[in-house]
């Protein structure tokens, strides 16, 4: 792959990632009790949970999360998160992203006042079609399967940091379960204790996974 193609692929991925993040990746949320899994394909669009003014945050800054992750998983090192410039001047959030490879990015929604994480995300962006040498369908399918496996591995690693009592195998099963149940859905969520897991499957445009804190009510405690 030539330099021009790599540059185009990088610009394409960065642009699409920015669009997906600024378009409120999880803009569809059905009404569901906190103890139930839920998915929506034709629900009314509402404000994503982490965008609400009273949305809780993890007691963790981006730097602290990255240090903890890289120490725990030195073979899956996350590069520094870079701030994403958006037109949301009055937004209470700061968005930042870290490139993992050509198709996978990690991003965060940071509370601007507290500087702690509201939403921690992984986004898989399929590479744009090659203009120079079209790939065979079977090669594309093979590459996509491998890319999705990497996504699932990072999902499992993220989950394990917030569920330290769970084995990595259990977290891997959880990641695969989320991807399967959220397949084809613009919003799929599972709430477990103080955590919300979200899958936003945009089909050929990519998949975003998020892990977010939940503010428990008195009845939940």
What residue spans do the PLM features occupy?
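Long, charged/polar, surface-exposed segments that mediate recognition or autoinhibition
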Residues: 109-180
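A cross-family detector of function-defining hotspots
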Residues: 73-110, 162-202
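Intrinsic-disorder-associated interaction segments
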Residues: 10, 40, 51-58, 62, ...
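Sec/Tat signal peptide C-region and signal peptidase I cleavage site
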Residues: 23-27
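Bacterial N-terminal signal peptides
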Residues: 13-22
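Bacterial N-terminal signal peptides that target proteins for export
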Residues: 2-13
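N-terminal leader/targeting segments
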Residues: 28-131
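Short, low-complexity, Pro/Ser/Thr/Gly-rich segments in the mature regions of secreted, periplasmic
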Residues: 204-221
